[in-house]
Amino acid sequence: MLVIRFKGWSVKLDHQVGGAGKFGIWSFHGSESSYVPDMETILRHAAIRPAEPKEGAEVEVLICDSRMPQDEWRAVGTGVAAYEAER
């Protein structure tokens, strides 16, 4: 499981499901909540750059749907990558 840590919160990602340019598209881990920007939209993916970060690397994160055009992704910031075993 890939965990991206921000100041005060984190995003848990399960596995890479695709890519777009230099971004990897990852699905949220099953224990994570979905991102719900409005009552009609549920987003369960994150676009991250680099696509497959090394432990401790800085990672840019955007919330998206795997079918969304890149200009509709929602930036959430930059965090630090960590790999954790499933609990």
Outline where the language-model segments fall.
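A short, exposed loop/beta-hairpin motif centered on an aromatic-Gly-Thr core
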Residues: 23-41
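Short hydrophobic transmembrane-like helices used for membrane targeting/insertion
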Residues: 3-4, 25, 42, 48, ...
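Short aromatic-glycine-(Arg/Gly/Cys) micro-motifs in beta-strand/loop hairpins
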Residues: 6-28
